[in-house]
């Protein structure tokens, strides 16, 4: 383990040169795979409009329903896990460029965005052409609700008022689904739309059918973090996450599961990052709500590569820990955090060092904030890794991922799309 200041700029050498301009442009955050998938859905709808024009009202309705169904179903937990299973089934002898692209599977939310926007546009066209009074009233009510959901899902509102975004998305989504049923029944569109709506409704309801309140044992090694332990009959796979709540109709928060090999149950590392996490750490509740199934997360893509580097800051160590413990893929850890033993406790730090004796741990309380792009690159180069996985805050994650990818190094990190 390295706890002293890492090597100087002279020792590390220069970062690799930037990719040529055309390739570098494709690595820009605005052209990330999430946005490409959203654009693909929108362009596919535009192509359909061009090829099928003019469109009859039933076709407009079917197009709206198909796109809105896409927006809902791609967020279903079983579908998400299927996406990851398919993408990570590629063997490591496949070309790196192919595996690099498959590793972006967690950008599937672009399909959600594209489907929601296209579906709303199709439904607007349908409503404008609807002559029926009651049907038109339901249509405009549904459009107003869809517009509210889309507006509050935009990053400026979602990032500042995430609790309100979550409530509007949940209750607005349920209300929109009820209105869609009403509209479909009034319009008499036949069995196919009803079958699609039934699938969408089941997709929405399924996680709530598994809603339950479970016991939790919580340790607080410092005022900054809580370690929550669960053992209610489920041992999740490494790289998955669990959503928990203290009030199921209000806020839900997802955290990376940390199962221990050979033991039942799992842990969550909960860092103080807002009112909800702060009250959880202060109160140490004995029971919380869970729903649905555990869902695959970004670090699951590690199996696509022969060696990976994990870059974490602060409580970002939580999502990395299950992969470090499972050791399915050779890995090297770079962890920057303030006073790790005082913040997270000796037991957790010793557990990390037992499986990562060569980890580079930068104590920010002693050495200040490091250049994480350079640290990530040095570990990638020295370890002979094929990819870097960064778990940190939004600003630093984008800085590391973009800083490496525009130099031709596969890099991955959360995209904060929910």
Predicted ranges, named:
Residues 1-418:
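FNR-like FAD-binding dehydrogenase module
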């Amino acid at each position: 383990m390295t706890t002293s200041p890492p090597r100087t700029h002279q020792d590390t050498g220069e970062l690799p040169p930037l990719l040529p301009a055309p390739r570098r442009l494709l690595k820009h955050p605005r052209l990330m795979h999430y946005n490409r998938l959203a654009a693909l859905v929108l362009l596919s709808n535009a192509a359909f409009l061009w090829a099928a024009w003019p469109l009859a009202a039933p076709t407009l309705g079917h197009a709206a329903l198909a796109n809105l169904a896409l927006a809902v179903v791609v967020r279903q937990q079983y579908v998400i896990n299927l996406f990851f299973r398919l993408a990570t089934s590629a063997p490591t002898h496949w070309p790196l460029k192919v595996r690099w692209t498959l590793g972006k599977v967690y950008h599937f939310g672009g399909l959600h965005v594209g489907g929601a926007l296209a579906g709303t546009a199709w439904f607007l066209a349908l409503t404008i052409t609807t002559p029926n009074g009651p049907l038109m009233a339901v249509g405009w009510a549904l459009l107003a609700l869809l517009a509210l959901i889309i507006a509050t899902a935009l990053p400026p509102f979602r990032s500042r008022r995430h609790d309100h975004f979550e409530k509007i998305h949940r209750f607005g989504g349920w209300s929109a689904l009820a209105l869609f049923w009403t509209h479909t029944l009034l319009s008499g569109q036949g069995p196919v739309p009803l079958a699609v709506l039934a699938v969408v409704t089941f997709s929405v309801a399924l996680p709530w059918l598994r809603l339950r309140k479970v016991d939790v044992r919580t340790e607080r090694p410092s005022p900054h973090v809580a370690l929550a332990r669960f053992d209610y009959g489920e041992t999740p796979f490494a790289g998955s996450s669990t959503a928990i709540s203290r009030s199921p109709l209000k806020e839900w928060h997802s955290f990376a599961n940390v199962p221990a090999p050979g033991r039942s149950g799992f842990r969550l590392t909960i860092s103080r990052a807002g009112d909800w996490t702060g009250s959880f750490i202060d109160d140490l509740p004995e029971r919380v709500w869970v729903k649905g199934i555990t869902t695959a997360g970004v670090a699951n893509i590690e199996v696509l590569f022969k060696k990976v580097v994990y870059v974490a800051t602060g409580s970002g160590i939580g999502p990395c820990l299950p992969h470090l413990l499972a050791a399915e893929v050779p890995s090297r850890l770079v962890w920057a955090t303030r006073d790790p033993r005082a913040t997270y406790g000796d037991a957790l730090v010793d557990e990390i060092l037992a499986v990562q004796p060569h980890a580079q741990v930068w104590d920010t309380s002693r050495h200040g904030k490091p250049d994480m792009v350079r640290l990530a690159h040095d570990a990638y180069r020295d370890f002979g890794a094929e990819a870097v996985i960064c778990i940190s805050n939004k600003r630093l994650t984008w800085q590391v991922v973009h800083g490496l990818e525009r130099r031709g190094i596969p890099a991955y990190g959360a995209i904060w799309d929910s």
